[in-house]
A protein has these predicted regions:
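Core nucleotide-handling region used for phosphoryl-transfer chemistry
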Residues: 1-218
Length: 218
């Protein structure tokens, strides 16, 4: 007898936000359930066994910023709501990872390219892809036999093509670009963040003032 039941769960990091499965949940860090609004956007596109991982960007239903630094909102081109809270106007969803779990519990990891293609097919927005290929081909002038790892990271950390140490290319407000994520194509969920120094400095100043972001809170 197959007693498997499929249903929808939405969560933030390790905390289930769906009130039907977590009766103790509330507005959490933000005081409002922005995760349910994002789930309403993504849910219609998921098949049984699929899990979508994404960033929610822009503003909250109460007008607060989802992400801010030094009092400035990372608006990502969105506007605070003046009435009905709307996807595409007040907030957005950017998908960065997809998995499929089969009935036996085995997990299949979508490649970074497949995530991009799936989002295009479904009319959803993936995270911005700046480069796809071998790391060694990004800077062919760097010798792979002479401290390549250190030289590669040093070059990447200041590469204006990726807006490193620049203002955010997607925000109307003048806020520092957060950085980039390097995703390794190895059928595993293996990714590394390279944050901009300007962003880290702003983050440190905010912490000194007692301002805590959602990642620190979690």
């Amino acid at each position: 007898i197959d007693d498997t039941r499929y249903d929808y769960l939405w969560s933030s990091r390790s905390v289930v936000k769906n009130p039907y499965y977590n009766g103790t949940t509330n507005g959490g860090f933000y005081g409002v359930d922005v995760w349910k609004y994002a789930d309403d956007v993504v849910r219609p596109h998921l098949q049984k066994g699929m899990t979508a991982y994404y960033e929610i960007v822009g503003f909250l239903p109460n007008g607060g910023a989802i992400q801010k630094l030094g009092g400035k909102a990372f608006d990502y081109g969105f506007e605070p709501p003046k009435g009905e809270y709307k996807y595409g106007e007040n907030f957005g969803v950017q998908i960065y990872r997809l998995t499929y779990t089969n009935p036996d519990g085995r997990v299949y990891e979508f490649s970074a390219r497949q995530v991009q293609q799936w989002c295009v097919k479904e009319g959803l927005k993936p995270v911005e892809e700046y480069y796809y290929g071998y790391a060694k081909d990004l800077y062919p002038d760097l010798s792979v036999s002479e401290h390549w790892n250190e030289n590669f990271l040093q070059r990447l950390a200041s590469d204006k093509n990726f807006f490193m140490e620049c203002e955010s290319p997607t925000c109307n407000n003048k806020v520092p670009h957060e950085g980039i994520v390097i995703k390794i194509e190895n059928s595993l969920s293996e990714a590394y963040k390279l944050k901009c120094i300007k962003f880290l400095e702003g983050e440190s100043k905010s912490l000194d003032k007692g301002e805590v972001d959602i990642e620190t809170e979690s």
